[in-house]
Amino acid sequence: KDFNNRKSVLNGVFRHAVLNEIITFSPITDLPCNTLKFKLPNASKKAYTVEERAMLLSYLKTLEQDAYTLAIQFAFYGIFRVGEIKGLTWDTENENIITIKQQLVEERTLQEDMTFSHPHRVLKDPKGNPFYSIRTEELPEAGINILRKMKELNPNGKLVFMHEGRPLTTDTFNRRLKKYCGELGITYLSSHKIRFTNASMLFDAGVKAIDIQPLLGHSNLAMTQHYIGQRTTERDSTEMARILA
């Protein structure tokens, strides 16, 4: 899949070059891809454990609070995409319930010289079918307290999470998260894996997949199945011997 994704990007670039008469033909079409064989990737960790989540939250609370430390904490109290956190706006109707109605993304455009422009921020509908991805989530008290703290730090901002008057960036969010994981000796997983973590914690606690689906903003249950069921507790290596004794 990764190879095909990269091939599609290259194919688009070379096709653009042919259409603009920069080159005469696309070399991608001559690649003998049908004979290629790929080794399956090793299984990778897709979620923080409950213990790692608790360690991160406890540690983050000891730091000087800013929009990034608070946004990382906030991510662990819901099932959000990082772009949805960046695009969150103030809701004065109900403090406990947030409406996820947009995401803030950084986009680049392919220029005539075949280079990409500097990223520019765009507010868009949440990823996927808006009928499902625009949704509400009820927050625990800890999540509400984070919003209250952000209101103190950013009382007049158009967006909830703003750092020094500017919207957050995904790169800085993940760079900070990686830094804090390193300081704790925890394996770093990106912001998107926090979504896996929280969805799996709900599933482990007995919440049905069909009830987790709307919280993730998914249009079908099959997509949700990919997120839930990740390991959030350490495996008991003695379990088999005990059961089969």
Positions of PLM-derived features:
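Hydrophobic (often cysteine-bearing) scaffold residues that line and stabilize catalytic clefts
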Residues: 2, 6-10, 67-68, 81, ...
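Conserved tyrosine-mediated DNA breakage-rejoining catalytic core shared by Y-recombinases
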Residues: 87-149
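C-terminal catalytic core of tyrosine-transesterase DNA break-rejoin enzymes
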Residues: 73, 77, 83-84, 179-183, ...
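Active-site/catalytic core of tyrosine-dependent DNA strand-transfer enzymes
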Residues: 138-186
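N-terminal core-binding DNA-recognition domain of tyrosine site-specific recombinases/integrases
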Residues: 1-16, 20-22, 42, 167-170, ...
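Basic, Lys/Arg- and aromatic-enriched nucleic-acid-binding interface segment
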Residues: 4, 8, 19, 23-25, ...
